[in-house]
Amino acid sequence: MDFLKKKWSYWFTTLDVNHDGVITRADVDSTLRDFPKLEGLSEAEAKLAIKRIDKWWNMYILKGRKKISEPEFLKDLEKQYTHDKEAFKSTYRACFYDITSVIYTDHTKSISLDNYVKASKMWGHNNEMLLRKSFDLYKPDHGMIPIKEYSDDWANFITNDDPTKPDVVMETYKAGLV
């Protein structure tokens, strides 16, 4: 369980967009404000994306709460995981599919470096040099990562309790690239 908690803690730091130690509506609002600008979305596209991102935050992260601390976040994930491991895996596969289907707006079913950098900036990560190195850990084919592969990598990161299995997201965090 310690291995998973370490990974969940890393994820918490990504979700804590303003880096104040707590996930709150301010983190949600930051992503809702920044994403349409970063992607250059039309007003109609922005409204749809904002609605879907807001729903994602409420469904998978805040779950009706106004804020969540890291210990609460870890406890919540541990409770879900120990209660029903298969349901937990299914939930977080859906979680990452849902968010990647929103934030990769060009509908190519692949993530380019440009997509990756823009999406990372939405989460408060602005160092493009580190983001480029992080992107390269995914070993993109012709400069692209298939969305399904990326989504599966994140689901694996959150749900896999075996430290001997390859985990590109964990490698990204361990290398200090996010």
Language model regions located:
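Assembly/interface modules of non-enzymatic eukaryotic complex subunits
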Residues: 26, 37, 41-60, 65
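Helix-boundary capping/turn motifs
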Residues: 1-7, 24-27, 48-49, 91-92, ...
